[in-house]
């Protein structure tokens, strides 16, 4: 579960390396984000000579969490890190590659571009 002040790794080649969540979008009274939720984040670490810089406010989609995700068939999916993909206002990824695995739940939320870029779908 991702909440405000949580640090996340960036799982794409957009230039950002670490994000800090400052807001969960569309949460209402819920203050936490799970896989597939959109967050507002600040870039805390960035690669040099890339379009995204530190202290820039961006939108991102959470693709992996340390908190387990329970599916209806009984399968439990858990990751070693919290990771996100930086997106633009239309929901398309800013990078051209996605590193690591993503879950099938992103397909239901219409993030098919992220799924097509990922090397592994769980």
Swiss-Prot record:
State what this protein does: Binds to 23S rRNA.
Give the family, as the similarity comment puts it: Belongs to the universal ribosomal protein uL14 family.
The subunit structure is: Part of the 50S ribosomal subunit.
Q: Which GO terms describe its molecular function?
A: large ribosomal subunit rRNA binding; structural constituent of ribosome
**Organism name:** Cryptomeria japonica (Japanese cedar)
Q: Which SUPFAM superfamilies match?
A: Ribosomal protein L14
Q: Which residues form a coiled coil?
A: none
Gene Ontology CC? chloroplast; cytosolic large ribosomal subunit
Which residues constitute the signal peptide according to the record? Answer: none
Q: What is its main location?
A: plastid
Asked if the keyword Cell cycle belongs to this entry, the reply reads no
Subcellular location(s): the record lists:
Plastid, Chloroplast
Please give the biological process terms from Gene Ontology that the record holds: translation
Under the heading InterPro entries, the entry gives:
Ribosomal_uL14, Ribosomal_uL14_bac-type, Ribosomal_uL14_sf
Q: Which keywords appear in this protein's UniProt record, sorted alphabetically?
A: Chloroplast, Plastid, Ribonucleoprotein, Ribosomal protein, RNA-binding, rRNA-binding
Instruction: Report what the protein is called.
Output: Large ribosomal subunit protein uL14c
């Amino acid at each position: 579960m991702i909440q405000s002040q949580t640090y996340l790794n960036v799982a794409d080649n957009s230039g950002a390396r670490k994000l800090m969540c400052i807001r969960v979008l569309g949460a209402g009274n819920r203050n936490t984000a799970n896989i597939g939720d959109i967050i507002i984040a600040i870039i805390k670490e960035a690669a040099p000579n890339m379009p995204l810089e530190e202290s820039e406010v961006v939108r991102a989609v959470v693709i992996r969490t340390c908190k387990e995700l329970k599916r209806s068939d009984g399968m439990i999916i858990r990751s070693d890190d919290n990771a996100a993909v930086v997106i633009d206002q239309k929901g398309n990824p800013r990078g051209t590659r996605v590193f690591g695995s993503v879950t099938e739940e992103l397909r239901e939320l219409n993030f098919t571009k992220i799924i097509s870029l990922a090397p592994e779908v769980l």
